[in-house]
């Protein structure tokens, strides 16, 4: 009797682990994110909750990855760790060649501001500021000169096809346009990773497709994009889909394979 073939996801994970190095060693520079056996547990109501149970994830520079899973799968916990908003209970997390899993809160904040551009479900725009001023905001905090701020913010808005709406305030923009302003704001510091948490959660299906086209365009330009979602139809836009279940990676497939399975009702 022939041995059962290994699932594609396990083979891919094993290959990634082989090239991303051993514990304690910095991964190859091609890898922008490497987690090694990370766990996260916390106490809730006197019980220990194991949100992540040893996750090995490696993301190359310029990849477009969706992290998907149902409520309670651990995807939000993993997003918080990737975004340097939290630290693992055990294991290693390397971001752009730096081991960030044991950094102080101040050091984490610096890494977060420099390396990660966040896009959230809520747009979090200043209502009385123009699109350009909203995108400039992270550069104000970073002490960048006014001229340079305007140049970089204008470029970021052009990248999301909003060059003609720079002087408009949020209430003069559609929901999709507001989310594009938020994406431009996330891009303005030239982050290593664009980290999007349920970016279409407040949008209708047509506008969601519009935002997915923006992410696809950014990925085609070489931007590393990680998108967290519970919606298979949204995850299917990514080039790679990682599915979490019960705190572990249940599958790790190319977007093409995921779309094929989705079409078959799996």
Which residues are covered by each model-predicted region?
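Pre-NBD coupling/linker segments of ABC/ABC-like ATPases
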Residues: 2-29
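ABC family nucleotide-binding domain
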Residues: 29-249
């Amino acid at each position: 009797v022939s041995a059962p073939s290994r699932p594609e996801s396990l083979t891919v994970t094993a290959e990634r682990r082989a090239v991303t190095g051993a514990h304690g060693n910095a991964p190859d520079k091609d890898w922008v994110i490497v987690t090694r056996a990370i766990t996260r547990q916390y106490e809730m109501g006197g019980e220990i909750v194991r949100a992540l149970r040893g996750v090995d994830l490696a993301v190359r520079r310029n990849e477009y990855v969706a992290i998907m899973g149902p409520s309670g799968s651990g995807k939000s916990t993993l997003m918080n760790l990737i975004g340097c908003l939290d630290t693992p209970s055990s294991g290693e997390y390397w971001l752009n060649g730096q081991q960030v899993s044991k950094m102080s809160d101040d050091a984490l904040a610096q890494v977060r501001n420099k390396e990660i551009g966040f896009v959230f479900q809520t747009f979090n725009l200043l209502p009385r500021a123009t699109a350009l001023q909203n995108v400039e905001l992270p550069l104000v905090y970073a002490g960048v000169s006014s001229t340079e701020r305007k140049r970089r913010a204008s470029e970021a808005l052009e990248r999301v096809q909003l060059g003609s709406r720079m002087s408009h305030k949020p209430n003069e923009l559609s929901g999709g346009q507001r989310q594009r302003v938020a994406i431009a704001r996330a891009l303005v510091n030239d982050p290593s990773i664009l980290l999007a948490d349920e970016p279409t959660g407040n949008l209708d299906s047509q506008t969601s497709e519009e935002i997915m086209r923006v992410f696809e365009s950014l990925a085609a330009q070489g931007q590393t994009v990680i998108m967290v979602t519970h919606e298979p139809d949204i995850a299917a836009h990514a080039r790679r889909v990682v599915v979490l279940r019960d705190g572990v990676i249940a599958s790790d497939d190319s977007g093409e394979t995921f779309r094929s399975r989705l079409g078959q009702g799996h």
